[in-house]
Curated annotation (Swiss-Prot):
This is Peptide chain release factor 3. It holds the Pfam family RF3_C. Belongs to the TRAFAC class translation factor GTPase superfamily. Classic translation factor GTPase family. PrfC subfamily. SUPFAM superfamilies: EF-G C-terminal domain-like, P-loop containing nucleoside triphosphate hydrolases, Translation proteins. The lineage of its organism: Bacteria, Pseudomonadati, Pseudomonadota, Gammaproteobacteria, Pasteurellales. The gene is prfC. It comes from the Bacteria. It comes from Haemophilus influenzae (strain PittGG). GO terms for cellular component: cytosol. The keyword Metal-binding does not apply.
Length: 527
């Protein structure tokens, strides 16, 4: 069999990043509508209503209306096969979001045009910078009153340090929103309100000086558009493919996801410009997506996607080669060969068995506790993909049982939740406490809720005197033993049995680092 490169070349794997409430879940819905994956987009407002958004499928997400877990959706568009990784938009889930960004080749950044660049967007952009991920920008919510579009572009350039190349330009906003003008095509696309849940035929006016444009949008707005475009074309950047691929320049589209307008414009841009599946760095070499032999890495573990079965699914990004049903793969970390006959493809919680998958695709492996985040699978070669870190948590709570006899179930539940990256667990060496660490407060609620629904364990969390944690290592065995002996009250094991220093205050941590210069205190740890 010759390896069909055209299959790899038509893949586009991307994630959507945004500040909470910038409209990311709505955009996900509309993208799937264009990809024919769903026929009527389930509106995301009306959190108690029956039409839940397709990508928010865990019980707690349905109640709260926030995307907590990463879903994967695949759909055809133009001549490409697009893999969309939906990431948690809520500020409390940055670690899961971070790891998802290790599995994509490009990102769509969604900005609320009334608010501009917000804090979470800044953090996520820092993460994409680590791998110079190409970014496409969608200025959303044009059906509301927005900030001046030139101001928005300036803010993106100054705050996020990336050049902007406007591809479309808005005509009015809020109640006066009339559509967008496409700079490269010299065409105006006219907006009709109330068309959000299905794909409509859009009226197109050719040419900027076409009198038809004045009739369609009104003389004032038509003239304003011409004036603004003169400024834009003088002051902004032209699109350059090379700068985009390097993560230095972002093409900018305007629209309203709720009104289902402008979404197809950035999808056209994504399929035309975004990179095909890229090579990946492993510990021994770089693996190219065009290689024939299979390789992939696990970036997320999701528990209980099927409430009827107490199962876990490991999400794996295929880096090279082709997955075929029933193939034998090497699980590198444990050195064992496994036959994978039941890998899954996804449509957010709806699963189908994968017959085949290529570089760029995401497949799900059934996991009975043997697979961890960061694991590499190959067709025999011993290598490990790098760059999938664990972060030291910023918040800590002690978990306490309502029924002390359920200690065993509690520990099992917490270890499983920590393996899938929902939370980190620490067991102090000197007592039986169970301390959980997270990047945001909401994760603690998620853990208590999932312990109850999935493990039948009633638990509560309470404050604990821990300010921060660091993984510790030392090359000098004798000095490490002395460090462990003198600091036993501050040492714990994490879910993977790695030794961790838990500090009651930052001052305490700084003192420990000064006292023991041979001990390395790590803020992140490779999975």
């Amino acid at each position: 069999m010759s390896y069909p490169l055209e299959e790899v070349n038509k893949r586009r794997t991307f994630a959507i990043i945004s500040h909470p409430d910038a409209g990311k879940t709505t955009i996900t819905e509309k993208v799937l509508l264009y990809g024919n994956a769903i026929q009527t987009a389930g509106s995301v407002k009306g959190k108690g209503s029956a039409a839940h958004a397709k990508s928010d499928w865990m019980e707690m997400e349905k109640q709260r209306g926030i995307s907590i877990t990463t879903s994967v959706m695949q759909f055809p568009y133009n001549d490409c096969l697009v893999n969309l990784l939906d990431t948690p938009g809520h500020e409390d889930f940055s670690e899961d979001t971070y790891r998802t960004l290790t599995a994509v080749d490009s990102c769509l950044m969604v900005i609320d045009s009334a608010k501009g660049v917000e804090e979470r967007t800044i953090k996520l952009m820092e993460v994409t910078r680590l791998r110079d991920t190409p970014i496409i920008t969608f200025m959303n919510k044009l059906d509301r009153d927005i900030r001046d579009p030139m101001e928005l572009l300036d803010e993106v350039e100054n705050v996020l340090k990336i050049r902007c190349a406007p591809i479309t330009w808005p005509i009015g906003c809020g109640k006066l929103f009339k559509g967008v003008y496409h700079l490269a095509k010299d065409e105006t696309y006219l907006y009709q309100s109330g068309q959000g849940s299905t794909i409509q035929a859009v009226r197109v006016v050719k040419g900027l000086n076409n009198p038809e444009l004045d009739v369609a949008v009104g003389d004032d707005l038509a003239q304003q558009l011409r004036d603004e475009l003169e400024l834009v074309q003088g002051a902004s950047n032209e699109f350059e493919q090379d700068a985009f691929i390097k993560g230095e320049l972002t093409p900018v589209f305007f629209g309203t996801a709720l009104g289902n307008f402008g979404v197809d414009h950035f999808l056209d841009g994504l399929t035309q410009w975004a990179p095909k599946p890229q090579s990946r760095q492993a510990d021994t070499r770089t693996v190219e997506s065009a290689e024939e032999k299979f390789s992939g890495f696990v970036f997320k573990i999701q528990a209980n996607m099927d409430p009827k079965h107490r199962d876990r699914v490991a999400f794996m990004r295929v880096v090279s080669g082709k997955y075929e049903k029933g193939m034998k793969l090497k699980h590198v970390r444990i050195g064992k060969d496994v036959v994978i006959s039941d890998a899954l493809t996804f449509m957010a919680g709806d699963r189908a068995h994968a017959e085949e998958a290529y570089a760029g695709d995401i497949i799900g492996l059934h996991n009975h506790g043997t697979i961890q985040i960061g694991d590499t699978f190959t067709q025999g070669e011993t290598l490990k993909f790098t760059g999938i870190p664990n972060f030291a948590p910023e918040l800590f709570r002690r978990i306490r049982l309502k029924d002390p006899l359920k200690q065993k179930q509690l520990l099992k539940g917490l270890v499983q939740l920590s393996e899938e990256g929902a939370v980190q667990v620490f067991r102090p060496l000197l007592n039986n406490d169970l301390i959980v660490g997270a990047v945001g407060v909401l994760q603690f609620d998620v853990v208590v809720s999932r312990l109850k629904t999935e493990y039948n364990v009633e638990a509560i969390y309470e404050n604990v005197n821990v300010a921060t944690a660091r993984w510790v290592e030392c090359a000098d065995g004798k000095k490490f033993e002395e460090f462990k002996r003198k600091n036993e009250q501050n040492l714990a094991l994490d879910g993977g049995d790695n030794l961790t220093y838990i500090a009651p205050t930052m001052v305490n941590l700084n003192l420990a680092q000064e006292r023991y210069p041979d001990v390395v205190f790590y803020k992140t740890r490779e999975h």
